Amino acid sequence: MSFGKAGTMHKWTLDEEQSGEVIRHALDLGINFFDTANGYSEGTSEEYLGRVLKESVARDKVVIASKVYFNPGRLSREAIMREIDGSLKRLGTDYLDLYIIHRFDYETPIEETMEALNV
């Protein structure tokens, strides 16, 4: 299942209303871990999740994970900083509990990527 605007890659995603229903039901069942990514449905997955969580639950009651990749700067420090800022804005929060690289980047030195993730 994926939340977000259906695009050319994933036409099976849930729209905002359906996403909200699923997220609220998950919260009602006690689910508190949500995973998304900067590239899921062109960022709308993060937007939908962020709006529902903001209206439904205190931020410290959920664990939010997001992932980074699929961007022009790959996994450079500059790209990671830009992408996490975008994810935080779309999610409507000032922190993530877990930030993951979506795929390994063979073109950026691993030291640069790891140092950026450790900020």
Name each region found by the language model.
Residues 1-62:
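N-terminal binding-site loop/beta-alpha segment at the start of enzyme catalytic domains
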Residues 57, 68, 117:
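P-loop/Walker A phosphate-binding loop and immediately adjacent motor/lid segment at beta-alpha junctions
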Residues 1, 37-39, 67-71, 101-104:
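Active-site beta-loop-alpha junctions enriched in small/polar residues
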